[in-house]
């Protein structure tokens, strides 16, 4: 989406969408593969306590990932809109301010994780062994927060500069490096969760460096230079980036908040085994979330560009194309989970842990039966973010967080572990119904205006 882009019409918009979506989906799935491989190695080498420790670290990891995505999505959206309007110097400014935010907020997140990791683990009810594993993991990740956040933001910025394939390669390099080092550090050297953390930081740092080099190279459509007078911190563009990307942060805060509530409730009404089973549902959810985020991210540059160019019909066409694929793949995955749950669960469980095997199968059936609606909510929030309607994007994500609380408070005392696992899908059904109504009203208004 730059000055060299050809005009996109309704005849070739599908091809343009897949040009962005396919590399993004591939990159998302491969980047998520290292998380899955982490879980496989930890489940087989460390066991249920290791899986529970990773899940209890997730509230902090989600905060870090969310801040990185907020900066990347906010800067990328404004960069694409500015390019669509023909304001190329302004687009460069958003890239520069995005990098400033990665540095400054990265330091803040590092301090929060290092200072608060043990308190949050204790709040979730972690026993001594789980707390030891999780605290060591978070210490390494915490010190490296700016680099990890940059690895999340950089592919989005590169993609919005018209280089989706390079964004995919960046994520592939980081993920494959992580997987190889996981095997060395966890299996061969026996470093446990600390080994997983070192592997993660190394792989993601490599990905971030590749993206940074591209932004300053002649191969970028908007090459940056340290000599630019705009290369200083500017409050207004930073505020615009943060406001636009805030819903992305909230999506991860929602995931962190959900993990915190579920971990605490499962330790109260169940045991470490139930938290480990919940962690396995999280890994399976990750596969679909990354697919949905990839399809939504592939939509974002096109929707932002068409919105900036005032082409509402093409905005609508791209959105509904992405929705068909998000919902369709979600339904297929849910059917597989309900019919063959053991295919997904047993790759994380050693033969010596039958209790976790039983708990995990029950957990995925109860917790994931409307997973496709979660994908729909991801896409809806991404759409509003892409058209710079941060208010509605934020509203969807905040509602997703708030609506779970009453379901957990009612179902947990009544049904115990079963009620805890049902809280998310039931609340998702309620929220998705409201979002469908919101979108139908908006697109009806758009059609009326176009007429």
Language model features with spans:
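Short runs within selected transmembrane alpha-helices of multi-pass transporters and secretion channels
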Residues: 72, 141-160, 167-175, 196-211, ...
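Short alpha-helical transmembrane segments in multi-pass integral membrane proteins
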Residues: 1-21, 79-146, 188-245, 303-370, ...
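Membrane-water interface regions at transmembrane-helix termini and the short interhelical loops
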Residues: 154-162, 182-191
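Small-residue-rich hydrophobic transmembrane alpha-helices
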Residues: 51-111, 148-162, 166-167, 277-341, ...
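Transmembrane helix-bundle signature of multi-pass secondary active exporters and lipid flippases
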Residues: 24-73, 77, 141-148, 239-305, ...
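Transmembrane alpha-helix boundary and packing residues in multipass membrane permease domains
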Residues: 24, 28, 40, 77, ...
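Juxtamembrane/transmembrane-helix interface segments of polytopic membrane transporters
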Residues: 31, 35, 39, 43, ...
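Helix-loop interface residues and adjacent transmembrane-helix termini in multi-pass membrane transporters
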Residues: 33-36, 45-48, 82-85, 160-161, ...
């Amino acid at each position: 989406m730059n000055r060299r882009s050809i005009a996109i019409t309704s005849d070739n918009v599908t091809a343009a969408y897949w040009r962005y979506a396919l590399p993004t989906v591939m990159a998302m799935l491969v980047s998520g593969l290292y998380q899955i491989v982490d879980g496989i190695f930890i489940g087989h080498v460390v066991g249920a306590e290791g899986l529970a420790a990773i899940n209890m670290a997730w509230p902090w990891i989600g905060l870090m990932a969310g801040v990185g995505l907020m900066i990347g999505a906010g800067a990328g959206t404004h960069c694409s809109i500015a390019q669509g309007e023909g304001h190329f110097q302004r687009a460069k400014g958003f890239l520069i301010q995005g990098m400033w935010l990665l540095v400054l907020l990265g330091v803040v997140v590092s301090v929060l994780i290092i200072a608060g990791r043990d308190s949050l683990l204790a709040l979730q009810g972690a026993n001594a062994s789980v707390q030891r594993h999780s605290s060591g993991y978070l210490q390494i990740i915490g010190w490296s927060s700016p680099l990890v956040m940059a690895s999340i933001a950089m592919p989005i910025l590169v993609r919005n500069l018209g280089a989706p394939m390079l964004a995919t390669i960046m994520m592939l390099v980081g993920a494959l490096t992580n997987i190889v080092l996981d095997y060395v550090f966890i299996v061969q050297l026996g470093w446990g969760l600390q080994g997983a953390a070192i592997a993660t930081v190394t792989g993601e740092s490599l990905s971030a460096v590749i993206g940074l080099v591209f932004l300053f190279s002649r191969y970028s459509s908007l090459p940056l230079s340290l000599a630019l007078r705009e290369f200083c911190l500017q409050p207004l563009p930073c505020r615009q980036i943060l406001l636009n990307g805030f819903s992305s942060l909230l999506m991860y805060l929602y995931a962190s908040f959900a993990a915190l509530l579920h971990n605490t409730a499962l330790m109260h009404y169940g045991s470490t085994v139930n938290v480990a089973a919940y962690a396995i549902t999280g890994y399976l959810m990750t596969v679909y979330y990354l697919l949905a985020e990839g399809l939504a991210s592939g939509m974002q540059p096109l929707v932002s560009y068409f919105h900036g160019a005032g082409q509402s019909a093409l905005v609508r066409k791209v959105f509904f194309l992405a929705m068909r694929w998000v919902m369709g793949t979600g339904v297929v995955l849910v059917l597989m989970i309900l019919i063959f749950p053991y295919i997904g669960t047993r790759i994380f469980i050693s033969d010596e842990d039958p209790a976790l095997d039983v708990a995990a199968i029950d957990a995925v059936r109860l917790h994931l039966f409307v997973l496709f609606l979660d994908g729909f909510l991801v896409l809806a929030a991404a759409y509003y973010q892409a058209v710079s309607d941060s208010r509605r994007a934020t509203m969807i994500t905040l509602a997703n967080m708030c609506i779970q609380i009453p379901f957990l408070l009612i179902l947990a005392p009544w049904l115990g572990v079963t009620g805890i696992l049902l809280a998310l899908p039931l609340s998702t059904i309620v929220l998705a119904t409201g979002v469908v109504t919101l979108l139908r009203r908006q697109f009806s208004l758009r059609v009326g205006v176009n007429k």
